[in-house]
Amino acid sequence: VVYAPTEPAEARLLGGQVATMHEGRITQCGPVADVYRAPADLRTALVFSDPPINVAQVHKRGEQIELPGAASWPVPSALRSRADGPLQLGLRPHHVRRPGAGGVAVRGPVLISELSGSESVVHFDVAGTTWVSLRPGVQDYAVGETADFELDVAQALYFDTDGRRLSS
């Protein structure tokens, strides 16, 4: 039996095997958890994240990954042999955490804070890119307030400029 939901959330809830498609072609197939944890490309990562995955342009320069105008961190071992240049970073909202959680510090003005059940979805700007943080409980941020966050870059997904996932 094949069930073809149009909503990615339904596919995630059904579990089992899943196939993702784009323009009539299968882009990835496998167990739901595997596709979620290791999406083959940026399009799959975007579809399989709710709230949507944060995507930012970063640069590999020597032994550092740079988020221009905001932060830098050591290059993951799997990307060390890759030539310097632009990459796309994917980081799910629950990996953008409160300060003191042990990640890469970023700060920026809050654009909006929404309550979603027992969690808050906080949208904020870092160097011209909108980021989303999924935080437990009710977070009371005023629009325009400068807020501090930490990126759990150990959980980051890296993609080339064409959107293909790189080992990380």
Locate each region found by the language model.
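Conserved H-loop
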Residues: 1-4, 6-13, 31
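Conserved catalytic segment of ABC-fold P-loop ATPases
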Residues: 14-20
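Conserved ABC ATPase "signature" C-loop
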Residues: 23-25
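Residues located in well-ordered beta-strands
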Residues: 31, 43, 57-59, 109-111
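Short acidic-hydrophobic catalytic motif
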Residues: 33-37, 45
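Non-catalytic connector elements of ABC transporters
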Residues: 51-55, 63-168
